[in-house]
């Protein structure tokens, strides 16, 4: 259950980050997430991949920046591929950015992931891990069912509508 809580909590922080970034830049407050729950799973997956890096990487900030940014960018690339190929939608495109890979990732946002990796490993996760570990298993199973149901409903809606805007039309 521990890793589920990591995924869930960092997906929620990702949602807050997306909303804050959109507000700060004057962009659209689009949902790049799930239908009902305020979660951005790409952030949860990226955080989990960062946390799975070997311990010796954590002791070397430049290496953590590079490998953490790469690990989270892998999660972002795979999420974009899944959205495009399986669900028939696209939530983001970095087509106009230098060095982009099929519009799914680019060096600028990989660097942002690297900075997030540093904050995650050195500040956020050490403070939150003990709190998340204390959550009782039955609570975890309830949340797991809710997230799975929302993920399924979101995927079905996106596949049927073929438009990410469908998540906003509730």
What is the predicted role of each segment?
Residues 1-170:
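Aromatic-rich, lipid-facing transmembrane alpha helices and their immediate juxtamembrane interface loops
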């Amino acid at each position: 259950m521990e890793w589920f809580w990591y995924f869930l909590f960092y997906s929620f922080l990702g949602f807050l980050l997306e909303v804050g970034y959109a507000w700060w830049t004057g962009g659209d407050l689009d949902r790049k997430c799930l239908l009902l729950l305020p979660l951005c799973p790409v952030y949860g997956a990226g955080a989990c991949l960062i946390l799975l890096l070997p311990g010796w990487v954590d002791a070397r900030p430049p290496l953590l920046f590079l490998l953490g940014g790469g690990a989270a960018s892998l999660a972002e690339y795979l999420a974009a591929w899944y959205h495009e190929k399986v669900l028939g939608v696209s939530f983001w495109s970095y087509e106009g950015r230098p060095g982009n890979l099929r519009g799914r990732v680019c060096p600028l946002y990989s660097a942002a992931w690297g900075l997030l990796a540093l904050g995650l490993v050195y500040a956020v996760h050490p403070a939150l891990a003990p709190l998340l570990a204390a959550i009782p298993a039955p609570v975890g199973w309830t949340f797991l069912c809710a997230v799975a149901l929302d993920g399924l409903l979101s995927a079905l809606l996106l596949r049927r509508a073929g438009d990410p805007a469908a998540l906003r039309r509730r």
